[in-house]
Amino acid sequence: MLYGAVGFSLMTPLAYAQAIPAAAKMRPKVIVLTAFPPEWQAWTVEKSFQHQVLHVPGLIKPLICDSKDVCVTETGEGEINAAVTVTSLVKDAALDVKKTIFIRSGIAGGVDEENSALGSVYINNWVISWAFGHHYLSDQKQLAWSPPGCTDYATPGHCGNYTRNIMENLAYKINPALLNMAVNASAHVALENSTEAKKLDKTFAISAVPKVMVGATITGNDFWIGKANQAIAEQIVRRYTHGEAKYTNTAMEDLGDVAALSRFGLADHYLSIRGISDVDVPPPGKTEEEIWKTGDLYASALAERNAVIVTEAVIAHLLKGTA
């Protein structure tokens, strides 16, 4: 197991300027990272998380915890907010997170593939950067992408090493042992569904039955949509994982989470669990511009709920290992 039995002691919120004895530090077993109010509220409705509230400098919301040392916070949207939050948690004098499992739990954009119903949940095996490299308009006036130059991210002779490189954050492979545990823990969960989601599934001609799957998530701060960008996302994931992973969902925070953890040697303590709220291409008969004018089609509430269901199953399994 990645952590042993953990003690839990109440602390006054602000002894940050003073050295805190190691025995007095709070040691969360799990910290769930949410991005924005609907994801946060999907957890805060559970009164168990009012057992302890810790105000951590650098966080936009407090760290709220239950009696089993499982905590939740809201990071804000995007890679920068995610990285600032995770760094603040790791460096806070009142916390010891050396054995904590960090789980990003929230919604994501999915793909228009038959088996990827809205409300499905991906336990991600890779976290990939959308932004690095070169996004441009080709001579044929098509959206295009090329990878960063080798000297931008790698030491000489290691141009193919996109993973955990020393100069840019391009790709992180999730700890296989932690990933397998999460997949096994959620193998028999019952996901919810909704009439709204089923209608959208029919619109996109995809499955109407949400399921738990494994795939790669790509992280970027800009909201994009369309077949051209989808093809670029697929290209990036293939390149950075050497064909090992398949692009299945897109979100805004995960790379910031795991890159920050990596700086402290904690990248192997990270999971990304994402519920599919929308599809990354317009519905048939609609253009990208029409979507910007009218708004995308979402099943956000279902995606949030199912992400929580899977995350709770994973947490329950983790806690069994510390009993």
Show which residues each predicted segment covers.
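N-terminal export signals
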Residues: 1-15
